[in-house]
From Swiss-Prot:
One of its GO terms (molecular function) is GTPase activity. Monomer. It comes from the Bacteria. Residues 159-344 form the OBG-type G domain. Residues 1-158 form the Obg domain. GO terms for biological process: ribosome biogenesis. It comes from Campylobacter hominis (strain ATCC BAA-381 / DSM 21671 / CCUG 45161 / LMG 19568 / NCTC 13146 / CH001A). An essential GTPase which binds GTP, GDP and possibly (p)ppGpp with moderate affinity, with high nucleotide exchange rates and a fairly low GTP hydrolysis rate. Plays a role in control of the cell cycle, stress response, ribosome biogenesis and in those bacteria that undergo differentiation, in morphogenesis control. This is GTPase Obg. The lineage of its organism: Bacteria, Pseudomonadati, Campylobacterota, Epsilonproteobacteria, Campylobacterales. The keyword Magnesium applies.
Amino acid sequence: MFVDNVKFHTKAGKGGAGCVSFRREKFILFGGPDGGDGGDGGNVYFKADKNSHTLSKYKGKKLLKAENGAGGEGRKKFGKKGADLVLIVPPGTSIYDDKTGELLFDLKEDGEKVLALKGGKGGLGNVHFKSPVNQRPEYAQPGLSGEEKDIRLELKLIADVGLVGFPNVGKSTLISTISNAKPEIANYEFTTLTPKLGMVEVDEFSGFVMADIPGIIEGASEGRGLGIKFLKHIERTKILLFMIDMSNYRTLKEQFNALKEESTKFSKNLANKLYAIALTKADTVENTDKMLTEFCDEFGFGSRQIPNEKGEFDKTKPVFVMQISSAANKNIKELKFALLEILKAQN
């Protein structure tokens, strides 16, 4: 099951207690103090691992805690440090303080590891409290409590290209055609129920990651449909690919305006993101060239942007508008190269 939002309480380990002990050896009846210190409590870490893809392992968990430190022992022996707790999460996981809403960490890279909570210090043994006026102290410190927090984890998948479109527009077909992703494909709405990532190989040395989310419907930004729940997963992408159905009963203009409106309402980040447009199912209708030209003319788009001298594109307009057909393999190769070219220009 795909889980992208979980809450739990986490606690670092408590420090072990210091030891009250006195030296006991043959012929030494009243030896001095030799109580050792307690071990420190274990820390809590979060670590991003590319082999982790969901937060499902933490669903339903109430408390996750590191190990407590062991108590000190006689003969000045230190207690063992408590084992650290390392919580593995997928890259793209944001870690929040659930009480304050503060963003604590944002793990984007594989292998990234952060210290979230420190374990408590171990208590001092009675060997530390010997003094001229107290040669046999019968006191040792208790260990200190470890830090604790209510934590919320939120996963936003990391991909280069994010697909945005209405249900049944052909997103799943496209990602299965040009990548290694194998989503369910059928002729009904909401075939895609969870986000999917696919690696697109353009040539022997180049490629990029594409993300498919459930279809957007009008009113998605207010919570209608499935798409709103997963729009956050394309916030990290470098470019959005708006997919518009050429065979739909609604005009290309109406579909595009609705998609832009929903993504803009959802977040400013999506509204200001670089985007391109793919006109899908071009094999199922006639006069596709005319439809493409009329669509671009209505908005004042060119079919392809040329970046400025700094390599920047105008984000208020699509980088390109291209008609495609996954079923007929029309312009699929051209689409891959066009997307790769844009991604390279962003680096």
